[in-house]
Amino acid sequence: MQVEGFEFPDELYYYPEEHVWVKIEGDMVTVGITSLGQYMAGKIFQVTTKNKGEKVTPKSVIFTLESAKWIGKFRLPVEGEIVDINDEVVKNPTLINEKPYDAWIVKIKGDIKKEKLLPVSEAVKIFENDAKRVIR
């Protein structure tokens, strides 16, 4: 789905407060930043994640992104363990700006609070409001 010129794939779930996309596969989730989220951040030059094997809770900072104008700490409604980190994105963070839905950041195995995530059809109003605020 397109929202104000930004792509939001229908098959993903979203945590709109953090501008995070989530792909759910059984008890595994793959996590990245939305196209609008990367636009709002600007050119991303650093990605820092928890280590593989570390436990996470909904209060844990799972990863941090840095751009020239912003530092963002990301949390998710998930309890589990980091099972994979996209080393390519950590080494070359601008991949998030170039292809945000290919440039996943971490994979987590555990209990995702799916009721806290939204399909794009339910998140569209939030994304529309945020996009209108940042597009000039």
UniProtKB/Swiss-Prot annotation:
Cofactor note text: Binds 1 lipoyl cofactor covalently.
Pfam families membership: GCV_H (PF01597)
GO biological process, one term: glycine decarboxylation via glycine cleavage system
InterPro entries (alphabetical): 2-oxoA_DH_lipoyl-BS, Biotin_lipoyl, GCV_H, GCV_H/Fam206, Single_hybrid_motif
Sorted UniProt keywords: Lipoyl
Residues recorded with modification N6-lipoyllysine: K69
Domain Lipoyl-binding: 28-109
Signal peptide range in chain numbering: none
Keyword Cell division: no
Cofactor: (R)-lipoate
A GO cellular component annotation in the UniProt record: cytoplasm
Cited PANTHER family: GLYCINE CLEAVAGE SYSTEM H PROTEIN, GLYCINE CLEAVAGE SYSTEM H PROTEIN-RELATED
Similarity annotation: Belongs to the GcvH family.
Function: The glycine cleavage system catalyzes the degradation of glycine. The H protein shuttles the methylamine group of glycine from the P protein to the T protein.
Assembly and interaction partners: The glycine cleavage system is composed of four proteins: P, T, L and H.
Protein name per UniProt: Probable glycine cleavage system H protein 3
Species, as recorded: Sulfurisphaera tokodaii (strain DSM 16993 / JCM 10545 / NBRC 100140 / 7)
